[in-house]
Every structure is written in C-alpha cells, then in structure tokens.
C-alpha cells in the first residue's frame, strides 16, 4: 500500500483535510484512520507508507514508487518526507534521505501491540536546497 499526499501550496491544496480510508468499513476503517491520524500529525509528507508484500518484493516496485515521489518533489522543489521501519531505514539513507530526530508515534490502541512505538521519519531535500539539511 502506498499513500501519497502532495502539498506544495499549503491550505490551497487541502492541507487541512482529514485523512480517510473510504474503501474500508467498521472497525477496520476506524483502526486505519487512527493510524493515518498518527502519521498526519507529524506534518507534510509526500510518501506516507510504502510496502510491497509477498510476490512484488525484490522486483523494484518499491524503488519505482520512491523514484516517482522524488521526481515530484524535485519538480516542485519541496522536501520529500517519509516514515520508515527500522529495517527500511538503511534503504532510505542509501537513497540520500536524512533521519529526523523526531519520529512518528504510533499508538498501541491503533496497532493492538503492548505499547506505543516510534517509526523513524526521513527527509530528502530538493536540489534547490543546495546541501541544506532539514535540522541544521
């Protein structure tokens, strides 16, 4: 699943809209929307979630999704943000993403695990930023 949110004109692009998952119903919809709200609170991202379960793995689908997002970010000259698993962090840093000091907190009631946990959040600046880092 991949969820893209491109906001390069602020509120004019619907930045204040509520994330929803209209294709689900009942408890599944409620749980998914809670998860999206946790991600949404971190800020403006281009790529919120990318995964390639099962057969598509190791066929380059994830790389194609990342390349598309980086191309959009470069054309608009905006940073590209994404969350990661700890395992995926190596992949993103090899692509030039910088890990931010604050991650996305995922609530236990959303994932039904024992406690809240934090996912790393990364950013890749556009070429117009000229080696400027996000946090310093």
Curated annotation (Swiss-Prot):
<keyword id="KW-0012">Acyltransferase</keyword>
<dbReference type="GO" id="GO:0016746">
    <property type="term" value="F:acyltransferase activity"/>
</dbReference>
<protein>
    <recommendedName>
        <fullName>Probable acyltransferase SID5</fullName>
        <ecNumber>2.3.1.-</ecNumber>
    </recommendedName>
</protein>
<dbReference type="InterPro" id="IPR016181">
    <property type="entry name" value="Acyl_CoA_acyltransferase"/>
</dbReference>
<keyword id="KW-0808">Transferase</keyword>
<comment type="pathway">
    <text>Siderophore biosynthesis.</text>
</comment>
<comment type="function">
    <text>Probable acyltransferase; part of the gene cluster that mediates the biosynthesis of hydroxamate-containing siderophores that play a critical role in virulence via intracellular iron acquisition during macrophage infection.</text>
</comment>
